[in-house]
Structures are given as structure tokens and as C-alpha cells.
Design a protein with these regions (language model features):
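Charged, low-complexity intrinsically disordered segments
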Residues: 1-153
Length: 153
């Protein structure tokens, strides 16, 4: 679905759909803790160390949470690579459930391809060459399909 028709795509670094970014300012209650953003919640799943989790909780921005997590890669859970996509999908579902605006924007996206337009990240986004995996966009589309299916029931 990476054709040239931008009418069928939403790049969610753009303001109208920035809610899909994990850096957007939507607080998230995740596993009984309040996190500043979904980015914070996502990185919290990487660690079991209570001191590191406290540091993460006190970071001032999603970017700082990401930097702290990357600086402690040696402390990631052993199974992290195997579970990270599932963790992210659950966090996205939580974000939709907790924020009616996010759900509204997701439903407004209709059947369009959702793309994390990050030139730095070819795993979660589509990268500098626009040939990345776009896993975050794909997960949002899966969540959208599931939300739409539940709405019809």
C-alpha cells in the first residue's frame, strides 16, 4: 500500500493526526501507573528495575523517556524483542480506550494507510528512504480494525 496516492495515507507526525504519535501529550494509565505519554508506558515495559522505573516516571518528556531507555539497553527484559509489538498494540488499545479524542481521530482515519512519518526510524516508522517497516502505523491500523469491529457489535 505504499503507492503514490497520498489521498489514501495519513502521516501522523502532521498536527491533525499527531494523537497517534507516542510523543503526543495524552497521559496513560498503564498497569496501575500514570504515565505522561504512551512512549513512557511503552518503555516502562522494558524493565523490572524499580529504580529505573521511578527514573522513567520522572522524565519530563517522551524524548527523555526514550533516551533513558536507550541508555539502559543492557537492562532490557530478556524477551523484549519477542514481545515489543504485542506490548505496543496493547498500549495503543489503552490509549484509545482512555481518550475519546484519540478514538475519534482513529475512526476518522477510515481505511487510509497510517504512516509514522519518521525519517529516523525504519522499524516503527517508514524511515529516511520511505521503505521502513512502519510497525507503529500497521499496529494503529490493526487497532482501528478491531475498534470498528467492536463498534458494529
Amino acid at each position: 500500500m505504499h503507492g503514490l496516492d497520498n489521498e489514501k495515507r495519513i502521516f501522523f507526525y502532521e498536527q491533525e493526526f499527531y494523537a497517534f504519535s507516542n510523543f503526543s501529550s495524552f497521559k496513560l494509565n498503564w498497569r496501575g501507573h500514570d504515565w505522561m505519554t504512551s512512549e513512557h508506558a511503552y518503555h516502562s515495559e522494558k524493565f523490572d528495575d524499580p529504580d529505573l522505573l521511578a527514573q522513567l516516571k520522572n522524565t519530563r518528556s517522551a524524548h527523555d523517556a526514550m533516551k533513558l531507555a536507550y541508555a539502559n539497553k543492557n537492562k532490557y527484559r530478556a524477551d523484549w524483542d519477542a514481545i515489543k509489538l504485542d506490548v505496543m498494540k496493547k498500549i495503543l488499545h489503552a490509549k484509545v480506550a482512555q481518550h475519546p479524542y484519540v478514538k475519534k481521530k482513529l475512526l476518522e482515519s477510515s481505511d487510509k494507510e497510517l504512516i509514522e512519518n519518521s525519517w529516523r526510524d525504519d522499524f516503527w516508522g517508514w524511515g529516511s528512504n520511505q521503505d521502513g517497516a512502519n510497525h507503529l502505523g500497521k499496529l494503529w491500523m490493526e487497532v482501528r480494525d478491531e475498534v470498528c469491529a467492536n463498534e458494529k457489535q
